[in-house]
Every structure is written in C-alpha cells, then in structure tokens.
Amino acid sequence: MEPHLLMLGFLSFTIVPGCWAELCLYDPPEVPNATFKALSYKNGTILNCECKRGFRRLNELVYMACLGNSWSNNCQCTSNSHDNSREQVTPQPEGQKEQQTTDTQKSTQSVYQENLAGHCREPPPWRHEDTKRIYHFVEGQIVLYTCIQGYKALQRGPAISICKTVCGEIRWTHPQLTCVDEKEHHQFLASEESQGSRNSFPESEASCPTPNTDFSQLTEATTTMETFVFTKEYQVAVASCIFLLLSILLLSGFTWQHRWRKSRRTI
C-alpha cells in the first residue's frame, strides 16, 4: 500500500500503513549562523524527489516516505534532453541485481543497526539529486542545531527544536541557541554568565495566553453589554409610562369636556 498525502483545509495529514500522522505545516525555525539536521526521521516523514537543473523525476516518483525503519520508493532523475544515452544505465543480469541489492541491504543494516522503532535514518543520495532536500516532518520530530564553521555556541538550554502541540496547535519549539563569532565568543560568554537563567522558562508557559486574561475580558464585555441593555430597556419603560400617563390625562380631559357640554344643554 502506497502512502498518500491528504490536504484538508489548513490541516495536512500523512496516511501510511497503520499510521495517521499530522504534518508540521512549517519548517523548523532558522537560527542565524546555524544549521539543523535530524538524526532520525519519524514514521510518516516525506522527502520530495527533487532533481537538479536539467534533470527530471523518473517514473513520476514525486516523493519517498519513511515507513517503519525504511524509506519507500527510490528517487530517480533522468536528463531532460532527448539524447540521454549516456545517462542510461546498462541493465544488469537478474542475479547480479539481486546480489547488489543484498550487499546494499547488509551494508545499510550494519550502519543503521541502532535504528529506533518507527524511525528512519538519512535516506541515501540518488544520481543528479538537487542540492537541497525538502522534508515534510510529522508531529514529534526532533532536529538538532549546530553552529557553522567560524562560530561558537552560546546556549541556555537544548539546541534542539521539537514539532509538537503547543497551545492547541502544532508548531516548532525555539532552540535555546545563539551562534557568535569565535573572536567575540568570550565577550558574549561573560554577558551570558551575568544574566544567568533569568530569561529561561518553558516555552509552553511563555507562549500560551493566560486563560484568566481572556476570562476577565469576556466578563467585562458581558457586564458592559448587560449595562447597555438595561439602560436601553429602562429608557423604553419610562417613555412608555409617560405616554400612558399623557393618554389617560388626554382621555380624562375629553370625557370631562363632553359631560360639561351635556349638562349645560340640559339647563
């Protein structure tokens, strides 16, 4: 069974055999002068089959997915030109193919024998692959950040980012890492030591709005609305009473005038 990608409104899901994984809609956060890398990929992760310029995907293989401990499909690129005889690989005998596949599998198993259940290692490169790989991570994925050459790390916490549910939505946590020039490292280090851990606090507590604030705002709005409604109803009631009183007085006046004229005619 092949994995499929399902887009439903603003939510993205990956459907793989025996797995329903929600995708992280955004890429991991960028840290200046640092790069990130996943040491392993969770079950359901998707990698686009991208080819470098002048080449295209072969057999319409759009992506490969992490299923269990291995990647489904194999990305292949072929030349866009009609004369691509040099890019064609001479077919090998079936026995030689099987032997080569077996050797490759043994080599892969020996290197990645510590694979975690439900995780895949970095997929092997393919010919004419694009320089940048585009992954679609799933919830629970962890990426590790490292400073580029010429920079050193200043960190108050783990230099990792995790795709997880925060405040009811899936997002990446921000890595506690700052990369500074090696020549200025000692200056920043002294500043960091003076600050200590004053600014360190869990992201879940810092990012989520306080429920009490929303409740107080809602209560205030409700009270204001009730006051407005009460004032308007009061004005309507007063106006109705005045109108009724004037009607009674006017009716009484007409009645008295009618009786007075009648009594005068009798006399």
UniProtKB/Swiss-Prot annotation:
Entry-linked SUPFAM superfamilies: Complement control module/SCR domain
Leader sequence residues: 1-21
**Where does the protein end up?**
Membrane
What is its membrane topology?
Single-pass type I membrane protein
- Tell me which residues are glycosylated: 33, 43
Which sequence ranges are listed under topological domain Cytoplasmic? 257-267
Query: What are the alphabetically sorted keywords of the record?
Result: Disulfide bond, Glycoprotein, Immunity, Membrane, Receptor, Repeat, Signal, Sushi, Transmembrane, Transmembrane helix
The residue ranges crossing the membrane are: 236-256
Q: Where is this region: Disordered?
A: 82-108, 191-215
Provide the disulphide bond pattern.
Answer: 24-66, 49-75, 51-77, 120-163, 147-179
The source's domain of life comes to Eukaryota
**CDD domains from the UniProt entry:** CCP
According to the UniProt entry, which residue ranges have a biased composition of type Polar residues?
82-93, 192-215
Q: Which GO BP annotation is one of this protein's?
A: inflammatory response to antigenic stimulus
Is Glycoprotein tagged as a keyword?
yes
Q: Which Pfam families match?
A: Sushi
Record's keyword annotation contains Repeat: yes
**Function per UniProt:** Receptor for interleukin-2. The receptor is involved in the regulation of immune tolerance by controlling regulatory T cells (TREGs) activity. TREGs suppress the activation and expansion of autoreactive T-cells.
**Quaternary structure note:** Non-covalent dimer of an alpha and a beta subunit. IL2R exists in 3 different forms: a high affinity dimer, an intermediate affinity monomer (beta subunit), and a low affinity monomer (alpha subunit). The high and intermediate affinity forms also associate with a gamma subunit.
Q: What is this protein called?
A: Interleukin-2 receptor subunit alpha
Whichever gene encodes this chain, its name is Il2ra
